[in-house]
UniProtKB/Swiss-Prot annotation:
The keyword Signal applies. Keywords: Disulfide bond, Endoplasmic reticulum, Glycoprotein, Golgi apparatus, Hydrolase, Lysosome, Secreted, Signal. Interacts with CLN5, ATP5F1A and ATP5F1B. This is Palmitoyl-protein thioesterase 1. Glycosylated. It comes from Bos taurus. Residues 1-27 form the signal peptide. Its EC number is 3.1.2.2, 3.1.2.22. Belongs to the palmitoyl-protein thioesterase family.
Length: 306
């Protein structure tokens, strides 16, 4: 009988101690949300000078975070090549499958896309709501596409020469649309009808041919959609595309901001509602394409990942 009383007292003491710990906040802090990264044109998941460095910066400021830098292909070389020549819709489908199978992402994740990876991850948010994306950070992404020839010096320059010639020959040719990544977000403001009818990727995710309510609902589920624009960008044309702006239809000189576009005024994608609710964040910094300092990154990007 005495033994039972002792056990009861021990159990009571443990319970009271647990309650006291709860009251005093002696709980392990929740694990940080995982981060998914998608690199840009001519880059790879793990280049130590680009995405590898970004991964280390995030891990330095957020200990214990799970960072998945997407590799599209079986090798780093294939990853780079696929950023030019693998159908974007196929890439998005593959990424959705990768995310759905990752047990560490099932409670939600943040996403950060660099250059074209920004609009590709937006497509993931719109098409694949499970697991849920919480914050989307687009660093130099081209959300209204481009109408200028890509400049990429160094090892990929010969590939860009080929792309220039191909886009000039016919960006909306069916075979080119199916096989050339940059053609899939090529947006010709002078021939909007041709773009609208023949773009197999950008025109779809931007609701150009009709309103897919699930796209709208899924994008609006984001907590924050952060867009970073590089004010001295020499690669993206027009630069305003990084904030969802673009050329006024019918010409290629004057640009209009997102808020004056049909996409916004008709709220075809939910961006107007998101803007009014404070879900859209527009950040700008001096510098060329993807040129940002550690200090700027820590001050302006890390808060959305913590």
């Amino acid at each position: 009988m005495a033994s039972s009383s002792c056990l009861w007292l021990l159990a009571l003491a443990f319970l009271l101690g647990s309650c006291a710990s709860l009251a005093l906040g002696h709980l392990d802090p929740p694990a940080p949300l995982p981060l998914v990264i998608w690199h840009g044109m001519g880059d790879s998941c793990c280049n130590p000078l680009s995405m590898g460095a970004i991964k280390k910066m995030v891990e330095k400021k957020i200990p214990g975070i799970h960072v998945l830098s997407l590799e599209i292909g079986k090798t780093l070389r294939e990853d780079v090549e696929n950023s030019f020549f693998l159908n974007v819709n196929s890439q998005v489908t593959t990424v959705c499958q990768i995310l759905a199978k990752d047990p560490k992402l099932q409670q939600g994740y943040n996403a950060m896309g660099f250059s074209q990876g920004g609009q590709f991850l937006r497509a993931v948010a719109q098409r694949c709501p499970s697991p849920p994306m919480v914050n989307l950070i687009s660093v130099g992404g081209q959300h209204q596409g481009v109408f200028g020839l890509p400049r990429c010096p160094g090892e990929s320059s010969h590939i860009c020469d080929f792309i220039r010639k191909t886009l000039n020959a016919g960006a909306y040719n069916k075979a080119i649309q199916e096989r050339l990544v940059q053609a899939e977000y090529w947006h010709d403001p002078i021939r909007e009808d041709i773009y609208r009818n023949h773009s197999i990727f950008l025109a779809d995710i931007n609701q150009e041919r009709g309103v897919n309510e699930s796209y709208k609902k899924n994008l609006m589920a984001l907590k924050k959609f952060v867009m970073v624009k590089f004010l001295n960008d020499t690669i993206v044309d027009p630069v305003d595309s990084e904030w969802f702006g673009f050329y006024r239809s019918g010409q290629a000189k004057e640009t209009i901001p997102l808020q004056e576009s049909t996409l916004y005024t008709q709220d075809r994608l939910g961006l107007k509602a998101m803007d009014k609710a404070g879900q859209l964040v527009f950040l700008a910094l001096e510098g060329d394409h993807l040129q940002l300092s550690e200090e700027w990154f820590y001050a302006h990007i890390i808060p959305f990942l913590e």
